[in-house]
Amino acid sequence: MKTKAPMKNIRNFSIIAHIDHGKSTLADCLISECNAISNREMKSQVMDTMDIEKERGITIKAQSVRLNYTFKGEDYVLNLIDTPGHVDFSYEVSRSLCSCEGALLVVDATQGVEAQTIANTYIALDNHLEILPVINKIDLPNANVLEVKQDIEDTIGIDCSNANEVSAKAKLGIKDLLEKIITTIPAPSGDPNAPLKALIYDSWFDNYLGALALVRIMDGSINTEQEILVMGTGKKHGVLGLYYPNPLKKIPTKSLECGEIGIVSLGLKSVTDIAVGDTLTDAKNPTSKPIEGFMPAKPFVFAGLYPIETDRFEDLREALLKLQLNDCALNFEPESSVALGFGFRVGFLGLLHMEVIKERLEREFGLNLIATAPTVVYEVHLTDNSIKYVQNPSELPPENHIACIKEPFVRATIITPSEFLGNLMQLLNNKRGIQEKMEYLNQSRVMLTYSLPSNEIVMDFYDKLKSCTKGYASFDYEPIENREAHLVKLDVRVAGDVVDALSIIIDKNKAYEKGRALVETMKELIPRQLFEVAIQASVGNKIIARETIKSVGKNVTAKCYGGDITRKRKLLEKQKEGKKRMKAIGKVELPQEAFLAILKID
């Protein structure tokens, strides 16, 4: 490890890109060019440390790496902060960008600007970052560099006449890019002699060192002899260790200077003690006020998670607590369901976040889980003028107690090739969307801005968007406000009992259609019983759809050979009596597929 560089030779930058535009590959190239990792240890997507990240080709957890580079005889330190590209993880992007002075805006030369790129670039511009446009994948035969440059200028308004053209796969233009980073991105500003002020922009749990904070030193410096005050909690802790970030191993250091990025170990048991966005300062000589402008991540989607083996409830709690150590956006509370037993109501940032958490619980902790239909938080105004916030359909008060229900809306930005515009607008209308703006970016691409109910996008909107545009559309959203809506609770009754885990809150006009589809699907999935089973969809006390599963008949007259008909009739009557009694007391076991099917029904 080379000696520390002066503050004027430090560059802190991040990479903004949409999924699949080559961000992790470009990060690999920069790491390789600066020899931060030996060729023997280098592997693709080195910044993506989770198996799920590599398999899905996405970045979930923002990583950082310290690179050394010599330019014109001077040693520079380049701190690269890798950011996720998916809409669910935009909170990771915003906090990573707060610790940088510049950002590389990476755009695929074959695809042009996408919705998520625009959203993250605006976050960077709000933080006054220097933006360097980078056109990636220029070696592909269908690359259209000039059109993409024009696209960036028209959509975002950044001058692209000197944009760097690179191919991360073929390692073209990487040296020029590194030199451009040094000459264009400003050095960090801050006062090295002021009291310590460090921004926590990420935290995670290490099995050996406890909760670790990834920090950017804004003012002053930190060393291993110091006592640190966490300003959010008001607690003081000794510094157990300081490290420079590297994807393969942490590099120990005795101090972190102003403008640097590093890892601080305070020997804490949980990341809740070092919340992201909090400020670290010197306990003996504290800074006057913490760093402003950080908001905790708020869950957007809620779902129930239940273990299939009911005795593994405590294992699920342990697993969620462990994941929460690394994921400050994950929150959960216990809940119980008549149909599914004990489980947890879990809050997620979005559907991908929910999928990733469920997959990690199953893969890393060996749990088998049932997830209920995802919901959002509704604002329910009651007739006694009070307001109740409901995230679980079973908590919705009776209809005669409700004055009105308000549901959260989002503003969605969608960029699509113009040939799919008709299909897309039809989908948005089906999802109760309200068009706000439509603008042609060029002859072949359109940007649509719609306001949509959050409830409509948490189910299957993303999949439907991709299928109706053959995968070419990109989508981003931001929450706006709660608006009044005509919503009802749709219940599913099996053999007369309400299955609370299958209840959903839905637009009144869609209730019949959804109810019919639900009971038809359930009829296919529930095995036949020894008694007749009625499956009903109801709104309040009104049954709106019904299907019946016929009973399995046992041939009770098989042993009668000819003889008197009254003997057979007596046996059949006895069987009918038994079935009637069974129907009154019998319970129907619902297969897991029934709960999964509700997510798939349009």
Swiss-Prot record:
Name of the protein in its database record: Elongation factor 4
A GO molecular function held by the record: GTP binding
One GO CC term on file: plasma membrane
Membrane topology: Peripheral membrane protein
Domain of life: Bacteria
Catalytic activity: GTP + H2O = GDP + phosphate + H(+)
Family the UniProt entry places it in: Belongs to the TRAFAC class translation factor GTPase superfamily. Classic translation factor GTPase family. LepA subfamily.
Sites where the protein binds GTP: 20-25, 136-139
Main location: membrane
The entry's keywords: Cell inner membrane, Cell membrane, GTP-binding, Hydrolase, Membrane, Nucleotide-binding, Protein biosynthesis
EC primary class: hydrolase
NCBIfam families: lepA, small_GTP
Gene: lepA
The keyword Protein biosynthesis belongs to this UniProt entry's keyword annotation: yes
Annotated function: Required for accurate and efficient protein synthesis under certain stress conditions. May act as a fidelity factor of the translation reaction, by catalyzing a one-codon backward translocation of tRNAs on improperly translocated ribosomes. Back-translocation proceeds from a post-translocation (POST) complex to a pre-translocation (PRE) complex, thus giving elongation factor G a second chance to translocate the tRNAs correctly. Binds to ribosomes in a GTP-dependent manner.
Species, as recorded: Helicobacter pylori (strain HPAG1)
Subcellular location(s) per record: Cell inner membrane
GO BP term (any one): positive regulation of translation
Annotated ranges, domain tr-type G: 8-189
Pfam families documented for this protein: EFG_C, GTP_EFTU, GTP_EFTU_D2, LepA_C
EC number(s) given by UniProt: 3.6.5.n1
